[in-house]
Amino acid sequence: MMPRIVFIGLLITAATLVGCAGVARDRTQGIALDSQDCCRTVDATPRQTAIVRTATQLIGARTIDVNGRRIAYDCAGVTRAIYLKHGIDLYQGGPSARHANGVRIIHAHIRQQGTFHQGPTVHPGDLVFFDNTWDFNRDGKVNDPLTHVGIVERQDQDGTVIFISRVAGAVERYHMNLALPHVHKTADGRILNDYLRRKGAIDPANTDYLAGELFSQFATRVAQQ
């Protein structure tokens, strides 16, 4: 039986959203992590901790029901459901077109009620956005901004960000290291960057596949007090 998560007390409006399917930014160099603030342990607020706890409870889930209604099972729908559990609707204030990209709806919400940043230090519960994780406009080019979103769980001492998202068949943990964006794993087998884009036979030569290569920006919706 497939794992199923049911959230009680929430309401999701049915909508057809496009985005996050499949596993416009040039990152030829990594981000330097020599700041004293980089990669230090960040104390999360109770609300940030609660958001992360909800996200971890979804790991392995393949369907998510809210008030008996199954929500859109993509990265944006999962991210929205997690925040809705804590009284925040990430779709509020975003474009309402029937076939809107859910990731861009969330991004528009943050422009109004949150803040964007590039790190290097991130907080538990932050959002992380990615570009070009699939050919959204189906033109065969690498020109698809804001195609994926996840929720930061933690940041390790080496700068690797662990985030939770739905990429393939289920909600899972994924890794991203912005200091070494082109490295999948170290010689000793530690994963630094997971693959977020599937390799296709007709991909352009400049196509990237790893999380660090596809990174766009972080966003804070629930700020430190």
Regions found by a protein language model. Name each.
Residues 81, 105-109, 189:
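Alpha-helix boundary/capping detector
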Residues 22-97, 111, 208-225:
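N-terminal capping segments
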Residues 1-7:
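Bacterial N-terminal signal peptides that target proteins for export
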